[in-house]
Amino acid sequence: MAIALSTLVEEADRYLDAARIQDYCPNGLQVEGRPQVRRIVSGVTASQALLDAAVEADADVVLVHHGYFWKGENPCVVGMKQRRLKTLLNNDISLLAYHLPLDLHPEVGNNVQLARQLGFEVEGPLEPGNPRSIVLLGSLAEPMQPADFARHVRDALGREPLLVDAGQPIRRIAWCTGGAQGYIDQAIAAGVDAYLTGEVSEQTVHSARENGISFIAAGHHATERYGVQALGDYLGKRFAIEHLFIDCPNPA
């Protein structure tokens, strides 16, 4: 079965409420390809490796969390950017990208999907009155020692996490996929036992140690694989078209 590209884009935009959310990049259709869609390939980032895999898979649309045209970047279509865009245009493949809308969504969002992967019970956002609050609060079904929790994260995500061990059991936790280490002080203020995100900065470790909470950096890529898969699955089922998630491993 095939559907119109415009129909797919309209549904993805509507489902994620993309127009409501201010972001650092355009959300939605970033590169237009052929007008009919039979197969979606999804991935975390619109890297050359993913594009090449999409060409090999005969995809009509590439669906990603990290697309192109970021605020403040050089707009010139040269080098890596030229090669990526050339691959899409030469093969008549569309690029569909959702950044913050995919972090925030209550069903297919990165943070909700990560909670399901790790077995967290979701309480709600860290900042309930802030519509752009992407950090979630929740708890573990049973308290875990930090080292045991880190092993649980490793087994679930297939990547060894960085652990700052506070030496106290973890029950209440805050988390945000990707590069959200800057929210650690807000997580501390919320009284959590641990904060989990994808990346770590030098000062993050000091904040965790000096405030007595555990911190886990589980990988930017590793924590953000699940939202785009869930969105692709939703669109595939919604329109009875094919969806294939392709993981291009990234140690970051």
Swiss-Prot record:
<dbReference type="Pfam" id="PF01784">
    <property type="entry name" value="DUF34_NIF3"/>
</dbReference>
<comment type="subunit">
    <text>Homohexamer.</text>
</comment>
<dbReference type="InterPro" id="IPR036069">
    <property type="entry name" value="DUF34/NIF3_sf"/>
</dbReference>
<feature type="binding site">
    <location>
        <position position="220"/>
    </location>
    <ligand>
        <name>a divalent metal cation 2</name>
    </ligand>
</feature>
<protein>
    <recommendedName>
        <fullName>GTP cyclohydrolase 1 type 2 homolog</fullName>
    </recommendedName>
</protein>
<feature type="binding site">
    <location>
        <position position="224"/>
    </location>
    <ligand>
        <name>a divalent metal cation 2</name>
    </ligand>
</feature>
<feature type="binding site">
    <location>
        <position position="65"/>
    </location>
    <ligand>
        <name>a divalent metal cation 1</name>
    </ligand>
</feature>
<feature type="binding site">
    <location>
        <position position="66"/>
    </location>
    <ligand>
        <name>a divalent metal cation 2</name>
    </ligand>
</feature>
<feature type="binding site">
    <location>
        <position position="103"/>
    </location>
    <ligand>
        <name>a divalent metal cation 1</name>
    </ligand>
</feature>
<feature type="binding site">
    <location>
        <position position="224"/>
    </location>
    <ligand>
        <name>a divalent metal cation 1</name>
    </ligand>
</feature>
<dbReference type="GO" id="GO:0005737">
    <property type="term" value="C:cytoplasm"/>
</dbReference>
<comment type="similarity">
    <text>Belongs to the GTP cyclohydrolase I type 2/NIF3 family.</text>
</comment>
<keyword id="KW-0479">Metal-binding</keyword>
<dbReference type="InterPro" id="IPR002678">
    <property type="entry name" value="DUF34/NIF3"/>
</dbReference>
<dbReference type="GO" id="GO:0046872">
    <property type="term" value="F:metal ion binding"/>
</dbReference>
